[in-house]
Amino acid sequence: MKYEAKAWKETEGACLRNFKEQAQIDSVNGALALRPQIEKIIDQIWEEGFDGIYFIGIGGTYASSMQVEVYMRGRSKLPVFVENAAEFLTTGNKKFTNKSVVIISSVSGNTKEMVELVDRVHEKGAKVFSFIDNPGTILTQPDKQDYLIVYPMNEQLKFYMVANYLMYKNGEFDDYDRYNKEMEANLADVLVQVEKDSDEWAYEYAKNKVAFWKEHKDLPHYFIGSGNQYGATYSYAMCYWEEQMWIRTKSISCQEFFHGMQEIIVEDTPVTLFMGEDEQRPL
């Protein structure tokens, strides 16, 4: 029998299409429940000593790495760095030693640059702490990681849990226990409610953007963000609009907007601004 997928129709409007509330709640709570495993691994890393923590990624995982690095930059004295995997493979980093620790994430577990990266890191005698979504993949193999957690999705949350415990260990997060108690009690339900509350707005946003794009297919859409939202800005433009929908985009940081981009923004130029709540919001 021929399979015929039922296509969503615009006339259906905002309808939380493909939204599975309980699955979403379970996914976030499952990630939060990884905290004891994360703390145990960080305790071991801390005991062994390190001269640098390197969040390294490619594409979307690089975006998440940028987010966690800027989050820690203004809060911690720990030596924390962010690197693009492909750049690290070609350029390296003279500060990187056999006492460095690399933290990575991968959905597929097979990404070419990340596989090459962990091999290079191990050649230098350094350690790799990996978050991998899919079991049985290349990056889960014993020779590709030193510390491993396999759990799907919630990449930024997992990175932030690492960051928070590192800062707690360094005496920089006094409210760590209270913070986690509140997160574990509320985060999953709050995130689900955000999806519900924003669905109507998201539908109108998407509908208007598609209508504009159909009339201006050669005009790129500009995305602007800063602070811990810049990684999301970069990822949303590249991974979602370009990679998945083949729509031309450009992402730029708020701090750079007035040094070039403002000169080409006119009345009908499509621009989306990501507004965060961290130290860089004034930008």
Can you annotate each of these PLM segments?
Residues 79-91, 250-263:
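A short, well-structured beta->alpha microelement
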Residues 1, 263-266, 270-275:
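Long, low-complexity, Lys/Arg-enriched
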Residues 12-52, 146-148, 154-155, 164-252:
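Active-site phosphate/pyrophosphate-binding segments
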Residues 46, 51-189, 226, 274-283:
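Glycine-rich phosphate-binding loops that contact phosphosugars or nucleotide phosphates
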Residues 93, 233-236, 261-264:
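Short, well-ordered secondary-structure micro-motifs
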Residues 230-233, 259-261, 281-282:
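Short acidic/glycine-rich loop or secondary-structure boundary segments that cap or lie
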Residues 68-74, 119-120, 236-244, 266-267:
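Short, solvent-exposed amphipathic alpha-helical segments in soluble enzyme
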